[in-house]
Amino acid sequence: MRVDPHTFAENFIPEDHFKSQARARGVELGTVDTTPGAGAFLRFLASTLKAQSVVEVGTGSGVGSLWLFDGMLPSGTLTSIDDEMEHSQIAKLAFADADIAPSRYRLINNSVLDVISKLTDRAYDLVVVRHNPEDLSYVINEAQRILRSGGALVIDNYYGGGKVCDAAQRDPRTVALRDAGKIIKNDTDHWVSSL
């Protein structure tokens, strides 16, 4: 029996009980959460960067946050921004279930446009963007300002369900994702890009 390589990669590092439970809560609310494969990559990247301070745009159900906590330094702090109060509430529940101390996170309920510009310059090791692609150009510029030298920006679910690869797709969300990719790819003074 042949296994699809994408399915194999997505399930190579299985989610623990806390992530599965958070994901199930998120499905009920319709949250946008990181996939298991992308979550494993976020854990890897946070660990490689020895991330102390991380910003997450789009808390969802907290699945991506839990993956980030797995890779961050034990004293690391996550700032997660989501404009949906229900998302922050179920994420907080997921963090409590996983025994993540409240001192390790800030859940901010507001628009990323109202929050990210107030974050401290050069104070973060990693910025993960999971939703609001229409705001991506602005978030990319702000990420450049708030990231420390050697920090990383991740646009989770960049492919937009395959639409970014399909030139015939012209909806605003897909165009915003494509434009964000071009900004990062073309700004070689500030970014080293990869898909």
Q: Where are the model-predicted features located?
A:
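A short alpha-helical cap/connector motif
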Residues: 1-126, 133-154, 158-195
